């Protein structure tokens, strides 16, 4: 929505755009305004060809596995969809020879356990999960390519942020959905995992 409001032509990718539902684009009312294409971000040729065909000025990498708990069950998926995919995109940009701004979605999970101290850009990384390790690795790849090739490559370190579009497996959506079920009489208890975990949330 933000980029569209700035007059951008926005192209969104999915592994299989022809069968993907793009539910969130529909909920936001921008489904018809975004061009949808198929890209496998783990495949160099797929990414390279897309960049050559569509010639973007900017690339925003928001893809990849996004659950800390799931990353322990599927650690390889975390590495491939975050670290490997970031490297492939960076290398594809470099190989085209085009000047393209690149934004990578980072994560506060890079910091890991900060002993209850707030984290900022000067805080050392100490990731504690496959997800955090993958995001930290991607961060360093972006920094390395930026320094080496002198291009506008950056990582935004995102802390927990909430949205009605967030999947139901995340804690806030889980709480809301269970409260609705309790109100409707289909549930009578709310089950949560580690209730000692502390998080800040943005919107």
Located regions from the model:
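N-terminal Rossmann-like NAD(P)+-binding domain of SDR-like oxidoreductases, especially those catalyzing
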Residues: 1-161
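NAD(P)-dependent short-chain dehydrogenase/reductase
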Residues: 115-118, 140-203
């Amino acid at each position: 929505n933000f980029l569209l409001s700035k007059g951008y032509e926005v192209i969104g990718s999915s592994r299989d755009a022809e069968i993907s539902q793009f539910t969130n684009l529909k909920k936001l009312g921008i489904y018809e305004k975004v061009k949808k294409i198929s890209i496998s971000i783990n495949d160099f040729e797929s990414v390279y060809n897309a960049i050559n065909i569509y010639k973007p000025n900017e690339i925003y990498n928001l893809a990849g596995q996004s659950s800390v708990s799931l990353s322990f069950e599927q650690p390889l998926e975390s590495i491939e969809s975050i670290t490997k995919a970031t490297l492939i995109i960076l290398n594809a940009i470099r190989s085209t020879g085009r000047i393209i701004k690149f934004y990578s979605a980072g994560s506060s999970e890079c910091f890991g356990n900060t002993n209850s101290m707030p984290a900022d850009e000067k805080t050392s990384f100490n990731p504690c999960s496959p997800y955090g390790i993958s995001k930290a690795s991607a961060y360093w790849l972006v920094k390395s390519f930026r320094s080496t090739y002198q291009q506008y490559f950056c990582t935004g370190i995102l802390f927990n942020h909430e949205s009605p579009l967030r999947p139901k497996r995340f804690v806030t959506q889980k709480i809301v959905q269970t409260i609705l079920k309790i109100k409707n009489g289909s549930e009578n208890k709310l089950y949560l995992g580690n209730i000692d975990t502390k998080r800040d949330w943005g919107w």
